[in-house]
Regions:
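Membrane-embedded segments
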Residues: 39-155, 169-171
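Von Willebrand factor type A / integrin I
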Residues: 178-253
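Juxtamembrane linker/hinge segments adjacent to transmembrane helices in membrane proteins
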Residues: 1-30, 34, 248-249, 253
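Short, glycine-rich, amphipathic interfacial segments at transmembrane boundaries or analogous
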Residues: 5-8, 53-54, 197-202
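Short, well-ordered secondary-structure micro-motifs
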Residues: 108-110, 168-171, 195-199, 248
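A cross-kingdom signal targeting lumenal/periplasmic-facing segments of multi-pass membrane
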Residues: 156-160
């Protein structure tokens, strides 16, 4: 089921913001109702061993910098497109989805119902995260717990992000994944960065700092590479080519 802490931010419209299109909220309410009905039943059905072994947890960065437009139209849109392509092509195995900013939340536990994950994915944005910031460590810890809860002795973790701000804590969390659940990083964004355009529900303005200057988040590839080297994670840059999906469509060796 969806993380209870995230549910209010998915379903409740903050009164201090302008009104938003109700269709995504209605869609999400429908999806949640389906999950509520199906959840207990699916948990009682043991998954085939091969399906449990081909388990993938996708970890999506929902910090404000993901609204930067240095990759058109934004880092977040490109990340969602990549996840969408992956889910549509991934016909076997179980997939889970976690989002993180200042904390981490499970959008979906490990499941073979990719259509439901896709429906939830379209609604996600930084403005719904309860805590600001960028903390990868709790997301990696949560990923491991999803594998354990699903009875998956092996699996893979794919993190789509533009930074690793809490490297020491994230390294500790990554070490707990060990060889059972190897970690991969997919970086989205550029070294030059770009302004962060806020969504229409927040006035369609650009994010500014306390001095009124535009916030332009640049991707520090060197820092991410250092984290990848220290954690043993593989590292790639996000692109939307279909051939880049092949590694995620085959069960791990």
């Amino acid at each position: 089921t969806i993380d209870p802490e995230l549910m209010p931010f998915l379903l409740v419209q903050p009164t201090k913001k302008p009104s938003v299109n109700p269709l995504p909220i209605l869609l999400l309410a429908w999806v949640v109702s389906i999950l509520a009905v199906a959840g207990p039943t699916t948990q009682k059905i043991p998954k085939p061993i091969l399906e449990r072994e081909d388990a993938l947890v996708i970890v999506l960065d929902l910090t404000w910098s993901m609204y930067a437009s240095d990759v058109t139209p934004s880092r977040l849109v490109n990340a969602k497109r990549k996840i969408t392509d992956l889910l549509m092509a991934r016909n076997e195995g179980m997939t889970g989805l976690i989002v993180f900013a200042g904390d981490a939340h499970a959008v979906s536990p490990l499941t073979d119902d990719n259509k439901t994950i896709l429906a939830l994915l379209s609604t996600l944005g930084p403005e719904m995260m309860p805590a600001p910031g960028s903390a990868l460590a709790p997301a990696l810890t949560l990923a491991r717990s999803l594998f354990v809860s699903a009875g998956a002795a092996t699996g893979r973790v794919l993190v789509i992000t533009d930074e690793v701000r809490d490297a020491p804590a994230a390294l500790s969390a990554a070490s707990a994944l060990s060889d059972q659940y190897p970690l991969s990083l997919m970086v989205v964004g550029t070294q030059s960065g770009a302004p962060i355009r806020l969504p229409q529900s927040m006035g369609d303005n650009f994010l500014k700092d306390a001095q009124g200057s535009l916030v332009i988040p640049a991707v520090n590839f060197d820092a991410i590479q250092r984290f990848a080297n220290a954690s043993g994670a593989s590292l790639t840059e996000l692109n939307l080519l279909n051939d880049a999906l092949s590694i995620w469509l085959e069960p791990p060796n």
